[in-house]
Amino acid sequence: MERFSGRNVLITGGGSGIGQATVHRILAEGGKVVAVDVNEDGLKKTLDRATADGTADRLTLRVLDISDEAAVVAGVGAAVAELGGLDVLVNAAGILRASHTHETTLDFWNKLLAVNLTGTFLMTREALPALLAGGKGVVVNFSSTSATFAHPYMAAYAATKGGIQSFTHAIASEYSKQGLRAVCVAPGSIDSGMTNNPGLPADTDLSLLAKLSPALGRGFAGPETVAGVIAMLASDDGAFVTGTELRIDGGTHM
């Protein structure tokens, strides 16, 4: 399957988890990718896998902090120049931290906002001119089931993801007549490095978390499952999908 042959794709969070899995999925389907991440070691692992797969010739890596405006302006500009245009932006980068809300510091709150919400905004703002130039640009943003359903100890994180959903709806409407599609994936119950280490409080009430198990009874899904959904949404197979979010949670929330 070569759904991304001739397509140029910029992916944040490409050094781990779902972002990394998406890099490899797009490369496997013929796309040309610039992967960015704040974690240089993670990007090296992405390159090692691409080299083993024989797709490294279509992959460019850049270390980038998406919460740094100047770095994003320079980084997106360089990525568009390297690719020769831009067809798809996947905003997979993000951080997950848990806390009792009454113990959440302003620094904690601001860090989550800076990376998850502001980072998504900055990347999208800088990528939009190139995405609009082709007339069929796609933005795939990352929300979470926590944006819609109660996830204890995740108030700050959930607020950022709810903001991303609203942001996605707004840009989907604003640029629809210019051919842009904007969609959200809302993963839940995914086995990734981020979800495995959320830093839950020491006195966490595990009974509150029990309801977050997948209904399918298959355990948590891997990052590759979400990457497959992203590939569908970003390709022509998702051509009639915009301004919405798709939950990927194994039926946890039905």
Region spans (language model):
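Short, small/polar-rich loop/turn modules that mediate ligand/substrate recognition or access, typified
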Residues: 90, 176, 181, 241-243
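Substrate-binding pocket helix/loop in short-chain dehydrogenase/reductase
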Residues: 100-101, 105-113, 210-211
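C-terminal substrate-recognition "lid" of short-chain dehydrogenase/reductases
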Residues: 121, 219-248, 253
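Active-site helix of classical SDR
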Residues: 124, 160
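Alpha-helical segment proximal to the catalytic Tyr-Lys
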Residues: 129, 173-177, 239
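Residue(s) in the substrate-gating loop at a strand-loop-helix junction
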Residues: 144
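Catalytic Tyr-x(3-8)-Lys segment
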Residues: 203-225
